[in-house]
UniProtKB/Swiss-Prot annotation:
CC per GO annotation: cytoplasm
Gene source species: Brevibacillus choshinensis
Protein name in UniProt: Co-chaperonin GroES
Record's keyword terms, sorted: Chaperone, Cytoplasm
Pfam families: Cpn10
Amino acid sequence: MLKPLGDRVVIEAISKDEMTASGIVLPDSAKEKPQEGRVIAVGSGRVADNGERIALEVKDGDKVIFSKYAGTEVKVDNKEYLVLRESDILAIIG
């Protein structure tokens, strides 16, 4: 499993429906990049100027909305994940 460093977060993207309301199946090239995901792992937090570690606001299991083109895509054990900074997360859902 991935263990992110610092203020980084590992997210598993949640894909939207692959079919339109009218029943048309969308090919991969027509799908938008997902912007929702579930937090899989979080880093230990960022280090402030005074050396103090500041914990992250998100935690494992949180469902989040993140910036469309944020992060780096990685593949581990045939699963795709996104590693991004906490500042790229826009909101926690629920």
